Amino acid sequence: MTNKDNTVEDLEQFIAPPAAENLNLEARNLDFYYGTHQTLFNVSLPVERNKITALIGPSGCGKSTLLRILNRIYALYPQQYAVGRVLLDGKDILTDHDTLTRLKERGDNVTLDPLGDDISQIRARIGMVFQKPTPFPMSIYDNVAYGVRLHFNKSRQELDHIVERSLHRAALWDEVKDKLKESGLSLSGGQQQRLCVARGLAVEPEVLLLDEPASALDPVSTARLEETLMELKKDLSIVIVTHNLQQAARISDYTGFMYLGNMIEFCSTDRLFARPKTRRARDYLTGRFG
């Protein structure tokens, strides 16, 4: 960005991360570019194991962009690139050969981890659920089994078990167990979103990313989804982007507040909502801007 007010040096920040030994995903010093236009500035994000981390901030602040870096979805678009590091259990999943070159140009002293070139494995280990439900035009069963068939060689009996278990974990099994052959598109919006969660869970990810998953859902469906996420964090780490401050306060353990492509404040959710340290976080949480 060209306006100097948008740079890290001009923004008051407060970062209180969890203990390093408890992290299973960590973004470090990320910059992100759409062509020559920079949209993220030296952003770091620690994700603690078996916790829910929320990202909040005004529209366009970089929340969804950060989420898409974490499992390399941006790599589908050649004009987009990230510079920095993303560590999954200590292994760098961001630094492929192209990124390594950019890091060295920036002056970072890093080596190449082979995992960075295996995007398929990365996306199996870090699942993603989008804002709008995206069921595939196939049966409920095949929706859940799709990723498993793509990544693993499983028997039909094993697939049956995985599909049932994933639907149970997504709190959807009781609603669909008698119509697994019906189209996933026949489900309600809330059910479709939980189907997408089940599809992501089927490949046994370590981390689940969710980009405003309840924005199009009614209050009842939102409550069901939140209950599901609270149960799921027993088995994996969750990062959720939300514009709903009450939702972040209800379900997250840690919250990061972003503004103009910067991580302004990061700490425990209770601490951020009760005693925000930065002026911009206080103003956002009290509704002075959005």
Curated annotation (Swiss-Prot):
The keyword Membrane applies. It comes from the Bacteria. The keyword tRNA-binding does not apply. It is a peripheral membrane protein. Residues 25-285 form the ABC transporter domain. It is an enzyme of class 7 (translocase). Keywords: ATP-binding, Cell inner membrane, Cell membrane, Membrane, Nucleotide-binding, Phosphate transport, Translocase, Transport. It is found in: Cell inner membrane. GO terms for molecular function: ATP binding; ATP hydrolysis activity; ATPase-coupled phosphate ion transmembrane transporter activity. ATP binds at G57, P58, S59, G60, C61, G62, K63, S64. GO terms for biological process: phosphate ion transmembrane transport. Its EC number is 7.3.2.1. It catalyses: phosphate(out) + ATP + H2O = ADP + 2 phosphate(in) + H(+). Gene3D superfamilies: P-loop containing nucleotide triphosphate hydrolases (3.40.50.300). GO terms for cellular component: plasma membrane. Part of the ABC transporter complex PstSACB involved in phosphate import. Responsible for energy coupling to the transport system. The complex is composed of two ATP-binding proteins (PstB), two transmembrane proteins (PstC and PstA) and a solute-binding protein (PstS). Belongs to the ABC transporter superfamily. Phosphate importer (TC 3.A.1.7) family. This is Phosphate import ATP-binding protein PstB. It comes from Zymomonas mobilis subsp. mobilis (strain ATCC 31821 / ZM4 / CP4). The gene is pstB.
